[in-house]
Amino acid sequence: MLTHKTCQARKKMQVSFVIRDAEEKQHRNGVNALQLDANNGKLYSAGRDAIIRVWNTRTDSSEKYIQSMEHHNDWVNDIVLCCNGRNLISASCDTTVKVWNAQKGFCMSTLRTHRDYVQALAYAKDREQVASAGLDKAIFLWDVNTLTALTASNNTVTTSSLTGSKDSIYSLAMNPSGTVIVSGSTENILRIWDPRTCMRIMKLRGHTENVRCLVVSPDGNQVVSGSSDGTIKVWNLGQQRCVQTIHVHKEGVWSLLMSENFQYIISGSRDRNIIVTEMRNPSNKTLVCEEQAPVLSLGYNIDKTGVWATTWNSDIRCWKLPMYDRCTLNSSGGMDAQWTQGGTEVACIKGGAAIKECAVLNDKRYIITKDSQDQVVVYDVLRVVKKEQLGAVDYEAEVKKRNKQVYIPNWFTVDLKTGMPTIVLGQEEVDCFSAWVSIEAGLPECVDPTTEIKINYGKLLLEALLEYWTPPHSIPPNEMEPDMHGNGYFQVPKHTPVIFSEVGGRTVCRLLVRDAAGDSESTLLHETAPQWVTDVVIEKNIPKFLKIPFFLQPHPQMTKPERTKKDRLVANEFIQCRKVCEHVLEKVLNAETTPSGGNANNSLQNSQSDANSEGSQLPAEERIELWCNDVVVDPNMDLRTVRHFIWKQSTDLTFQYKTKQNFNYDGK
C-alpha cells in the first residue's frame, strides 16, 4: 500500500491542464513585456499566454521564432535580461519569479516568496541585482549571481525586502548602479528606497491614479512616471518634487522608454498611440504610430532607429522612430527644428488568435470556442485534443445545433485567461467526479456490446493525465497481474501541461504528461498531489455514485391501478428510465418482465446490470409508459436528464406510470 504524504493539508487543491499544440510558435494573447539582447539580436517577449518566446530580429524572414520558454501557468508580466544576456528573470500572475538559462531556454529555479501576482521587475546592471514587486505590496531584492547558482541540493536563497508599501505595486525601476529604487502603486504615489540599505528615502505625490510605468535616470537624480491618469511626470529626487507634467495622451500611460541622453520620452498609452516627446520642451512632440490596441510595452531595436511595441493583441511590431533635426535651414536663413519622417512599420512578428468565448455542451465532454479572429473550434475535453476546426461559422448556431437533450453534471470549468483553453478539475463548487455516463454515450468507440459499463469522466481523465506517474516506494505489481497505468481506454497528448495549484492561490507543481515518469517529478507529485487525486490514480478507488430520490405513482388514466399511494425510491442518477419501467412491471404490477439485470429492484441500484437476460417477449419500455409533468418520458433518458429538462423543480422528481394499450397486466 502506498503511503501518501499529504502536502498543503490545509490548502484545497485543484488540477488544471491546457489543450494546445505541442509547440506554440505564436503568442496567443497580449504581450506584456520585451527585452532585447542587442549582442545577438534576440528579442524576448513575455506573453499573457504564460509563455516567454525568443525571436531572431536580425532576419528579414517572417519566420523569426527561435524557441519558447515554458514553466509559468499564468500571465508573464515582466522580464529582465541579466548577466550579459546569459540569464533571464521573469515575473508572473502565478505568484512566482523564475530564473532561466536564456541561451538554452530552461527554467533553473523558481522563487515563491510573493503571495499574489508579481507585476514588475527592476534590474541594476552594475550590481547584478533584481527587484520584484506585486499585488501583495511586497518588494524583494535578489542577488542574481546567487539565484543562478541555485541547484537541487543548494536551493536556499536569502532576500532583502523593502517595506512601507500600502497598496498593490504595478511598476518598479532601478538605476544601473543600484542606488535608487522606485515603486508605483494604486496609492497613486511614488515611493523611493535606497536598495543598499533598504531604507525608505521619500514618497512623491502628484498622480491621481495608478502609477503604471517608471524609468530612473542613470545618475539616480530623475524619475519619469506614467499613470492611468493620462499624464507623464518628471520628478527631481534632489528637490523631492515634480518638475514637469506632460499631457500628450488621452488615456492612461502604460509604457515608457527613454533616449540614452534622457532627453526624449517615448510613451505608449491605452489610447493606442506611441508618441515621442522632448522632456524639457513637451510641446515638441510627434506621433510615432497608432497601434491597433492599447500599448503594453516598448523596447528599442538593435540600432535604436526603431521601437518594438506590444499591445493587447498578440502581434509584435517594430516602428521606425522619427528623428529630431535641429539643423534645417528656414526661408529667412535661420535654423528650424523639425521631426524627420517616422512611423513606418519595419517589422512584424505575427501572433495567433486568443479564444474569447467558450460554451460547454450538454454532454459535458465537448466545448465550442470562438477566437479573436472569429474562428470556431470544437475541443474534446476528455481526450485533451482539438476535435474539429469549423472556421468562421455562426458560433451561437453551432452551439445550439450540437447541444443534445441530455443532462450531465458539470465536472470541470474552463479558464480562457491565457487565450488557450485551460480545463480546471477540483472538489469545490464543481466536483470532477460527478459525471458518470454509460460507456456507449461517453466512449462509443470503446463499446463492448455484451456489457453495460458506466464510466466516470473525471476518473478517466486524471488517470490519463498521470498515466506515467509511478510513485516512489509503491509496492511492485503482482507478476500475475498487469501493471495498471492509465485508464485502459485512451491516452492524452504527452505534451499536455498539468498544473497542481491551491484553489484561488499559488501554483505548487507544473509538469508535462510525459515527464511524470521522471524521478524528481514523481517525488514532487507524491508530495503535492491531493488525496482525491491519489485515491483514483494510485489506489484505483471508484468515485461514489450520486443518488436521486423520486416518487412513483399510477397515472390517472390507469384502468386498474393496484395502488394509489406514492412510492418513494432512490436510484443512481444515471439510471435510464427503462429501468424504472422494469421496476413498475415486476415490483408494482407483478408482471413478467424482460429485466435489465435479473431483479428490477436491483436495477435501480446497480448501473452495470445486463440488459439481455431472457424473459417476456416485450421489454418493459414497450409495455409501460412513464409520464413526468404531463410529458411522455423517453425510456433512454436517465433520471438526471428528466429532472433537468422535464421536471424542472427543486422538489423530488415524480413519475406517473401507466400500461400501454397493447399490454394487459392482468393477462399474464
Curated annotation (Swiss-Prot):
What the entry lists under SMART domains is as follows: WD40
GO process terms (BP): double-strand break repair via homologous recombination
Q: Where are the WD repeats?
A: 26-65, 71-110, 113-152, 164-203, 206-245, 248-287, 290-329, 350-389
Q: Which domain of life is it from?
A: Eukaryota
Question: What does the record give under GO molecular function?
Answer: ubiquitin binding
Keywords noted in UniProt: Repeat, Ubl conjugation pathway, WD repeat
Keyword ATP-binding listed: no
Matching PROSITE patterns? WD_REPEATS_1, WD_REPEATS_2, WD_REPEATS_REGION
Entry-linked InterPro entries: G-protein_beta_WD-40_rep, WD40/YVTN_repeat-like_dom_sf, WD40_repeat_CS, WD40_repeat_dom_sf, WD40_rpt, WDR48, WDR48/Bun107
Q: Does the keyword Repeat apply?
A: yes
Q: Where is this region: Disordered?
A: 592-616
Its family? Belongs to the WD repeat WDR48 family.
Per the entry, what this protein does is:
Regulatory component of the Usp12-46 deubiquitylase complex. activates deubiquitination by increasing the catalytic turnover without increasing the affinity of deubiquitinating enzymes for the substrate. The complex deubiquitylates the wg/wingless-signaling receptor arr/arrow, which stabilizes the receptor and increases its concentration at the cell surface; this enhances the sensitivity of cells to wg/wingless-signal stimulation.
Quaternary structure and interacting proteins, as annotated:
Catalytic component of the Usp12-46 deubiquitylase complex consisting of Usp12-46, Wdr20 and Uaf1; regulatory subunit that, together wtih Wdr20, stabilizes Usp12-46. The Usp12-46 deubiquitylase complex associates with arr/arrow; the interaction leads to deubiquitination and stabilization of arr/arrow.
Listed name of the protein: WD repeat-containing protein 48 homolog
Q: Which organism is it from?
A: Drosophila simulans (Fruit fly)
Gene expressing this chain: Uaf1
